[in-house]
Structures are given as structure tokens and as C-alpha cells.
Amino acid sequence: MSWWWAGAIGAAKKKLDEDEPSQSFESVALIIGVTGIVGNSLAEILPLSDTPGGPWKVYGVARRPRPTWNADHPIDYIQCDVSDAEDTRSKLSPLTDVTHVFYVTWTNRESESENCEANGSMLRNVLQAIIPYAPNLRHVCLQTGTKHYLGPFTNVDGPRHDPPFTEDMPRLQIQNFYYTQEDILFEEIKKIETVTWSIHRPNMIFGFSPYSLMNIVGTLCVYAAICKHEGSPLLFPGSKKAWEGFMTASDADLIAEQQIWAAVDPYAKNEAFNCNNADIFKWKHLWKILAEQFGIEEYGFEEGKNLGLVEMMKGKERVWEEMVKENQLQEKKLEEVGVWWFADVILGVEGMIDSMNKSKEYGFLGFRNSNNSFISWIDKYKAFKIVP
């Protein structure tokens, strides 16, 4: 049985066959956003000995110098700012052996029109630096997300689809940088008839990356650690409807597995796929798990005290500095490890459920237990000394 069918945490065999002699590579991956929450999972899974389509050679691209928590992955790390067309061309066009592109990065701007411009330009820069120069290019994976059906974060009162979300739902008649990215992908990829594509739309992602702009698990770990340090109850900062309502999440390893499946399986070509754990949960249940993982006895939802993390974490910078020193954590500022605005968005809504039927019908049967997934990523933030 393929590891993407196993559905367990760590389904991909986390083992490199170090004793094998050097070998030629069947596939060559280029991960754009390798230090991000899914990029980090791709960098761990692609080089494994049993990964489909392999053996894989892996290039990993990120804007910043390589962090210590990413350093063990056997990849060729390239520091490159893909928002800079010249930097992108000079560093990526020499990679003539690339066969597969995994585009899993994004940037955030103040308005959606600026998001469309910035994110569209980044994707175009990458594709124009690779497509004309990589004669063996076979496939491009583009990661977007559930906002395809909801619109941008600012679309509070605007049009949105009713869940469960399915891939055949039409685009909303609003600006959305995901739509811009799709259009650019289609425009650039049609220049080479032999290159195929897939689009992946994960829900809220459970994964590991201190650099991620949408890092819900890491952010909640930091909040819980501060509550534990101060002896405060772990109060749910979001809305009652989010506390009580059904939600779904996407394990970062599962997303990586789906992208690899789509990259190598002929039945998955030129299609868009939702990606979630194929189960549902309530925050009221995960909150108990979060409290247990940090040894907090008093926790829950209290009406009137759900002020949001942006408000609740004001003035906690000195507290975090003390915690970093006391626990010998990685020296990161509070604003680097706690994405409060994003957590407030996520913990203020409910019912963002998308269907996995299409993905299963096409042959991807991977899944995760969201409770176990949540715990496994909490453990990783502790192991890498992001939180105590």
C-alpha cells in the first residue's frame, strides 16, 4: 500500500537509505517556499527512499538564509527573492534539470489588488525562469487554498460559497489573488504542450514553520506557553460559533503527499483538488488537547473574555523574552512566532468545510486524524525549541 494511503501521522517513511550508493535521479523537484509550512514538509518527504516518482533530487528556494530547523533536509538550498525578476532569473534559470515545480509560497499586502500584483508577479517570475530553460519539465503544482471559495480575509460581508466547498464551484466575482495565480499558471504553461499542472486548495494548515504567515499551531503554542508561564487560564480568544462549530484542517505532510501524488499520477493531471484531513473537529475539543500539552488545568470559553489574540497579547514582549532566556528557546521575537491576526481570523469563523470526494475519486485516499495531527505538530514546535 502506498504511504499516501496509510492515513497515519508519519505515513511517509521518515527514513533515508544512507547506505545506498550514489544514484541517478528519476525526478528533480524545485520547491518555491521551502521554509514555509508545506515547503518544509515537501523538503522532508521528497528525498525519502520510498517517495513515488523517485529517487528525487530537490532544490529548495526561500528568501532568507537557511534556518537551522530546515538544515537536516538533504536538499540544495537556494536563497532567492522570487519577487525580484532578475534575482529569480539569474538563480533559477541555470536549473535546467528540473522536472517538477512545487509552488507553495505567498506574500501578504494591505489590499487584495496589491496581493494580486505581488503574488502574480512572483509566480510569473518563477515560471518564466524555469519553463524556457528546463527541457525535461513535466509538471507544476500550485498551492492556493480554501479562500478560493470564500474570498480574501477582508471579504467579511461579500459574496462567498456555502460549504461544503467543491472544486467545480465558479469563481466569486471579486478580486482574489488565487484567481490571478491560476490565470498566470495557465498562460505560462500553455507555451509547452508536454507540461501538466495541478492546483491544491488546503484548508487551515496544521504544520511546522516558524516563518509561516498562516501558522495556527505555532501561534496557539506560543499563546498557551505564555498562559502557562503566567499561571493564567487558557481562554479561547475567538467566537462562540467557532468554539461550538465544526471545522476541518489540513496536515502539512498530507498536503505534501497529495501534491507528490498529483505530480506523478497520470490521472491527476490538469485538475484542481481540495485537501483536508477528511475528518472534522470542534475547537472546544482541540482546546482541551492544547491545555493538556502545556499542563494547563483551567481552560475554556468565557463570554466577554474572548477579546482576540491581537488584543490579549499586547505588551507580552518582555514576558516572551524572559521565557526565551529561561527555557533556552530559539531567540525569536514574539511577533515572529505569534501570528495573532491570522489566529483571530481562524478562531472567529466556523463551518469552512470542503469536500474531499474529487480527490478520493481520482485516487488519492490519504487522510489524517486531526487530533493526532495537532499533537504531532505541537511536539515538533517543542522539539525545535520554539516553545517550552
From Swiss-Prot:
Entry binding sites for NADP(+): 35-37, 63-64, 81-82, 105, 143, 178, 205, 212-214
Subunit structure: Homodimer.
Organism: Arabidopsis thaliana (Mouse-ear cress)
Reaction equations catalysed: 5beta-cholestan-3-one + NADP(+) = cholest-4-en-3-one + NADPH + H(+); 4,5beta-dihydrocortisone + NADP(+) = cortisone + NADPH + H(+)
InterPro entries in the record: NAD(P)-bd_dom_sf, PRISE-like_Rossmann-fold
Similarity field: Belongs to the short-chain dehydrogenases/reductases (SDR) family. Highly divergent.
Tissue-specificity statement: Expressed in roots, stems, leaves, flowers, seeds and siliques. Expressed in the vascular bundles.
Biological role: Involved in vascular strand development. Catalyzes the stereospecific conversion of progesterone to 5-beta-pregnane-3,20-dione. Can use progesterone, testosterone, 21-acetyl cortexone, 2-cyclohexenone, but-1-en-3-one, ethyl acrylate, ethylmethacrylate, cortisone and canarigenone as substrates, lower activity with 3-methyl-2-cyclohexenone and 3,5,5-trimethyl-2-cyclohexenone as substrate, and no activity with canarigenin, canarigenin digitoxoside and pregnenolone. May be involved in the formation of 5-beta phytoecdysteroids.
EC primary class: oxidoreductase
Molecular function terms, GO-annotated: Delta4-3-oxosteroid 5beta-reductase activity; enone reductase activity; protein dimerization activity
Temperature-activity note from the record: Optimum temperature is 45 degrees Celsius.
Description of what induces expression: Up-regulated by wounding. Not induced by drought, high salt, low temperature or herbicide treatment.
Entry keyword set: Acetylation, NADP, Oxidoreductase
Name under which the protein is recorded: 3-oxo-Delta(4,5)-steroid 5-beta-reductase
Enzyme Commission number: 1.3.1.3
Active site per database record: 147, 178
Sequence positions bearing N-acetylserine: 2
Source organism superkingdom: Eukaryota
GO BP annotations listed: response to wounding; steroid metabolic process; xylem and phloem pattern formation
A single GO cellular-component term on record: cytosol
Description of pH dependence: Optimum pH is 8.0.
